[in-house]
């Protein structure tokens, strides 16, 4: 399967955040939320819906997002994604590219990705921010379904602001000896992480029971939580974000 979806949001003259381009292609279906939030000048809210079984071996799926100057977008998932083996040889790949112009804001909050046994999946996220742009990008990985060891997973995250790299991170899953190491995942099945580039940066790192909030040297912060299940991991992530100086803005809900 080959698929490309695209989303563009701009700030209208009346102060509303307007979806100017919305192009879906299975397995990615983009559904905008209409009504009160947009009319009141809140962010444009778009839901990310899986409309076909994917990713499977050999699939190539791309999502491209552009947020104009001063505009705000919240792109949120509705259900978990399951990476599966396929009849074709070779790995599957999902690529997310996000561009945010000056003064723009993006919140990319997909649901979890479950890496099933025998899957071989690559996930790449690249975020390019202009000066004074804001972003929060979440990733939740569930390593195997119940009672199942995960297949192979490689994720990479690249965040750049005004040409300066803020985060370049890669994670490789599939080596059982590493999975049990305290310096790796310590046997945890779920990893939740969120990269935050907002109005303020944490003055110092914070941490608790299997969660942490670490300021990045070039600006922004990385919140991380590991746990035996997704609910606990996301609670840990919420606790980490609660120690961010912009916690109130980062923990609000839009329904």
From Swiss-Prot:
Q: Which UniProt keywords apply?
A: Chaperone, Cytoplasm, Nickel insertion
A GO cellular-component term linked to this record: cytoplasm
Keyword hit for Cytoplasm: yes
Question: Which top-rank group of organisms is this from?
Answer: Bacteria
Picking any one GO molecular function of the record gives: nickel cation binding
Q: Which InterPro entries match?
A: UreD (IPR002669)
- Keyword Ribonucleoprotein on entry: no
Where does it reside? Cytoplasm
Please explain the role this protein plays, according to its UniProt record: Required for maturation of urease via the functional incorporation of the urease nickel metallocenter.
Its family remark reads: Belongs to the UreD family.
Subunit organization: UreD, UreF and UreG form a complex that acts as a GTP-hydrolysis-dependent molecular chaperone, activating the urease apoprotein by helping to assemble the nickel containing metallocenter of UreC. The UreE protein probably delivers the nickel.
In Swiss-Prot or TrEMBL terms, this protein is called Urease accessory protein UreD 1
The gene behind this protein is ureD1
């Amino acid at each position: 399967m080959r698929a490309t979806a695209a989303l563009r949001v701009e700030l209208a003259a009346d102060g509303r955040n307007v979806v100017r381009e919305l192009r879906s292609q299975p397995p990615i279906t983009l559904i905008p939320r209409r009504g009160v939030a947009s009319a009141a000048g809140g962010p444009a809210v778009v839901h990310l819906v899986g409309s076909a079984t994917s990713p499977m071996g050999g699939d190539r799926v791309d999502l491209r997002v552009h947020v104009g100057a001063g505009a705000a977008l919240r792109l949120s998932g509705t259900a978990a994604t399951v990476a599966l083996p396929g009849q074709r040889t070779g790995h599957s790949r999902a690529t997310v590219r996000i561009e945010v112009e000056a003064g723009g804001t993006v919140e990319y909050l997909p649901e979890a990705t479950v890496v099933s046994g025998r899957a071989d999946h690559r996930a790449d996220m690249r975020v390019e921010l202009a000066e004074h742009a804001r972003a929060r990008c979440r990733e939740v990985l569930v390593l195997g379904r119940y009672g199942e060891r995960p297949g192979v997973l490689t994720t990479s995250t690249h965040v750049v602001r005004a040409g300066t790299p803020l985060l370049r991170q890669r994670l490789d899953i599939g080596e059982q000896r590493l999975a049990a190491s305290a310096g790796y995942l310590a046997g945890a099945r779920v990893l939740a992480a969120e990269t935050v580039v907002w109005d303020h940066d944490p003055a110092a790192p914070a941490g608790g029971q299997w969660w942490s909030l670490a300021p990045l040297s070039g600006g922004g912060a990385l919140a991380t939580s590991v746990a035996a299940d997704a609910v606990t991991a996301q609670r840990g992530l919420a606790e980490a974000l609660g120690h961010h100086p912009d916690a109130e803005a980062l923990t609000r809900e839009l329904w």
